[in-house]
């Protein structure tokens, strides 16, 4: 199993990245929370990873923190939630926010994540209750990288998460100007969940 990668970030195409580790390029899918906290291409990066082996593919998923990876592992154990859906959930909310939503049995909040309906949200509450613990969130392993046009990047991220253009643009209107992309995505997602 590949548990962690440390190397040079060589590609960033949401939600995929490529990390060069001693001449071998590892492609990994990452949550948008992790993606917008990555350093610029060409800089050193460390990711916690989860390798999923299927009959037709080997899929590598990357996470900024061990806690995010642990949450991903719990999510994919829930019936009806696959790896891509779990990554979408972790893009829509942090591991802490997810843990709080499960603890508070906030089905509405959970079902607002892309690909999650009311029944799946109820199943998440049932199967994850007591398994996720909210922690104080730190800034993670990376410094945020400023984007040239934050609003456009935030809208693009929301579109990648499955929201339509109208919803994405409406959510971005509530984000203060000058907000970095990672924080902007979090604020826009909160606007969508209201």
UniProtKB/Swiss-Prot annotation:
Keywords (A to Z) from UniProt: Cytoplasm, DNA damage, DNA recombination, DNA repair, DNA-binding
Keyword Lipid metabolism tagged: no
Stored Pfam families: HHH_5 (PF14520), RuvA_C (PF07499), RuvA_N (PF01330)
Chain intervals for the UniProt region annotation (Domain I): 1-64
Stretches the record annotates as Domain II: 65-143
Domain of life per record: Bacteria
GO MF: ATP binding; four-way junction DNA binding; four-way junction helicase activity
InterPro entries: DNA_helicase_Holl-junc_RuvA_I (IPR013849), Hlx-hairpin-Hlx_DNA-bd_motif (IPR003583), NA-bd_OB-fold (IPR012340), RuvA (IPR000085), RuvA_2-like (IPR010994), RuvA_C (IPR011114), RuvA_C_sf (IPR036267)
Transmembrane segments: none
Entry GO terms, CC: cytoplasm; Holliday junction helicase complex; Holliday junction resolvase complex
Stretch list, region Domain III: 147-194
Location of region: Flexible linker: 144-147
Subcellular location: Cytoplasm
Alphabetical GO biological process terms: DNA recombination; DNA repair
Subunit structure: Homotetramer. Forms an RuvA(8)-RuvB(12)-Holliday junction (HJ) complex. HJ DNA is sandwiched between 2 RuvA tetramers; dsDNA enters through RuvA and exits via RuvB. An RuvB hexamer assembles on each DNA strand where it exits the tetramer. Each RuvB hexamer is contacted by two RuvA subunits (via domain III) on 2 adjacent RuvB subunits; this complex drives branch migration. In the full resolvosome a probable DNA-RuvA(4)-RuvB(12)-RuvC(2) complex forms which resolves the HJ.
Record comment regarding domains: Has three domains with a flexible linker between the domains II and III and assumes an 'L' shape. Domain III is highly mobile and contacts RuvB.
Purpose: The RuvA-RuvB-RuvC complex processes Holliday junction (HJ) DNA during genetic recombination and DNA repair, while the RuvA-RuvB complex plays an important role in the rescue of blocked DNA replication forks via replication fork reversal (RFR). RuvA specifically binds to HJ cruciform DNA, conferring on it an open structure. The RuvB hexamer acts as an ATP-dependent pump, pulling dsDNA into and through the RuvAB complex. HJ branch migration allows RuvC to scan DNA until it finds its consensus sequence, where it cleaves and resolves the cruciform DNA.
Family note: Belongs to the RuvA family.
Protein known as: Holliday junction branch migration complex subunit RuvA
Encoding gene, per UniProt annotation: ruvA
């Amino acid at each position: 199993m590949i548990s962690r990668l440390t190397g040079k970030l060589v590609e960033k195409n949401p939600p995929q990245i490529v990390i060069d580790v001693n001449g071998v390029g590892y492609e990994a899918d990452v949550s948008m929370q992790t993606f917008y906290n990555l350093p610029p291409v060409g800089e050193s990066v460390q990711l916690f990873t989860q390798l999923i082996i299927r009959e037709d593919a080997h899929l590598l998923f990357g996470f900024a923190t061990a806690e995010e990876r642990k949450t991903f592992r719990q999510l994919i154990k829930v019936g009806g939630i696959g790896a891509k859906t779990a990554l979408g959930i972790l893009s829509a909310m942090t591991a802490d926010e997810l843990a709080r939503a499960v603890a508070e049995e906030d089905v509405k909040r959970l079902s607002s994540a892309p690909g999650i309906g009311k029944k799946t949200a109820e199943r998440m509450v049932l199967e994850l209750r007591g398994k996720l613990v909210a922690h104080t969130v730190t800034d993670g392993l990376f410094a945020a990288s400023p984007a040239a046009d934050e609003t456009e990047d935030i809208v693009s991220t929301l579109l990648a998460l499955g929201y339509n253009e109208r919803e994405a643009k409406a959510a971005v209107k509530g984000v203060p100007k000058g907000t970095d992309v990672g924080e902007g995505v979090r604020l826009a997602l909160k606007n969508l969940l209201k």
